[in-house]
């Protein structure tokens, strides 16, 4: 079934560009490692692929059951972390795939649900956990000291006034609602109402990345993709934050034989050269003005893609040890 209708309500960022990078041939097996609302998966199915879709959010998996029914046996949903996609596939007897796609960060579906605690525009419990496991945003913000909070805001949100915001958060504790946190950040930054970009944007992003250990997950996911992509398989990664994009850029540069030194997210090069596991990456792709106007979230998106070679995957996870906050 290649005539599966496209649902514009679920169109993710850079959809056409991702599908072009994947160059899907009918019958190929592709992984949508961040299922979300199913936008990439739907397009992969429409191109004739068999799709294995993964998400750590149980609500996303539950919401995808209707699409499974439409897909005539070509869609499998897996609840799990994309950093473990190689293990999740192996448990199902799959050792190689033709393509893997990552859409890093929070989904529009999660932002639209105020009760999930991701949005500064909708009031809800200060949660931000994608899988409802571990420490919530409220738990962390109400126990962490000012310096730890400031470091997270600076490194994961590029918030230049992180110290000011952290002091305001500590002074306002306890915080339990997203509206409370958003108000504290706005007041700390003295940003006028109606400004083009909400001043709470960076802080909410940084806290979410920290709570869900998203950079660690990205590092693990890239290494897992290297292990399960067949020779000629395609990798496509859409990121929304400068640190995420740097991790992807340096991973592909190193794995394609380039020099990835100079980043705090990478270890020093080893003496023994390893065979390139990816061809030279395609040029990065950014959204056009029309997509940015249609979807403001697209403004910060970057797509990077590359094709797998026949070289064996590098041993271990050479980036994981370098990731820390």
Curated annotation (Swiss-Prot):
Chemical reaction(s) catalysed: cytidine(1402) in 16S rRNA + S-adenosyl-L-methionine = N(4)-methylcytidine(1402) in 16S rRNA + S-adenosyl-L-homocysteine + H(+)
Places the protein is found: Cytoplasm
The keyword Signal appears for this protein: no
Keywords annotated in UniProt: Cytoplasm, Methyltransferase, rRNA processing, S-adenosyl-L-methionine, Transferase
Region (Disordered): 256-275, 281-307
Pfam family, one: Methyltransf_5
InterPro entries given in the database record: RsmH, SAM-dep_MeTrfase_MraW_recog, SAM-dependent_MTases_sf
GO molecular function, one term: rRNA (cytosine-N4-)-methyltransferase activity
GO cellular component terms listed in the entry, alphabetical order: cytoplasm
SUPFAM superfamilies reported for this sequence: Putative methyltransferase TM0872, insert domain, S-adenosyl-L-methionine-dependent methyltransferases
Single GO biological process annotation from the record: rRNA base methylation
Positions contributing to S-adenosyl-L-methionine binding: 38-40, 55, 82, 103, 110
Disulfide bonds: none
EC number per UniProt: 2.1.1.199
Family membership noted in the UniProt record: Belongs to the methyltransferase superfamily. RsmH family.
Annotated protein name in UniProt: Ribosomal RNA small subunit methyltransferase H
Organism: Sphingopyxis alaskensis (strain DSM 13593 / LMG 18877 / RB2256) (Sphingomonas alaskensis)
């Amino acid at each position: 079934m290649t005539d599966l209708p496209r649902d514009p309500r679920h169109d993710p960022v850079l959809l056409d560009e991702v599908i072009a990078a994947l160059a899907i041939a009918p019958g190929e097996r592709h992984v949508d490692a961040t299922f979300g609302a199913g936008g990439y998966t739907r397009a992969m199915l429409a191109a004739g692929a068999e799709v294995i879709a993964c998400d750590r959010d149980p609500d996303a998996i539950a919401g995808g059951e209707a699409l499974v029914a439409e897909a005539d046996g070509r869609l499998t949903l897996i609840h799990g972390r994309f950093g473990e996609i190689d293990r999740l596939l192996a448990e199902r007897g799959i050792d190689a795939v033709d393509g893997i796609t990552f859409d890093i960060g929070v989904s529009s579906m999660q932002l639209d649900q105020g009760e999930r605690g991701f949005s500064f525009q909708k009031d809800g419990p200060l949660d931000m956990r994608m899988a409802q496991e571990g420490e919530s945003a409220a738990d962390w913000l109400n126990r962490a000291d000012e310096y730890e909070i400031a470091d997270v805001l600076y490194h994961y949100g590029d918030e230049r006034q992180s110290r000011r915001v952290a002091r305001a958060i500590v002074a306002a504790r306890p915080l339990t609602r997203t509206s409370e946190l958003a108000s504290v950040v706005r007041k700390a930054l003295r940003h006028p109402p109606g400004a083009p970009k909400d001043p709470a944007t960076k802080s909410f992003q940084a806290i979410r990345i920290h709570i869900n250990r998203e950079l660690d997950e990205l590092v693990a996911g890239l290494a897992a993709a290297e292990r399960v992509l067949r020779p000629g398989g395609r990798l496509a990664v859409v990121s929304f934050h400068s640190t995420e994009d740097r991790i992807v850029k340096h991973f592909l540069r190193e794995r394609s034989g380039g020099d990835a030194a100079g980043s705090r997210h990478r270890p020093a090069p080893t003496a023994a050269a390893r065979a390139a596991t990816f061809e030279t990456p395609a040029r990065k792709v950014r959204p056009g003005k029309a997509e940015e106007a249609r979807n403001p979230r697209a403004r910060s998106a970057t797509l990077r893609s590359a094709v797998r070679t026949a070289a064996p995957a590098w041993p271990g996870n050479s980036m994981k040890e370098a990731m820390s906050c």
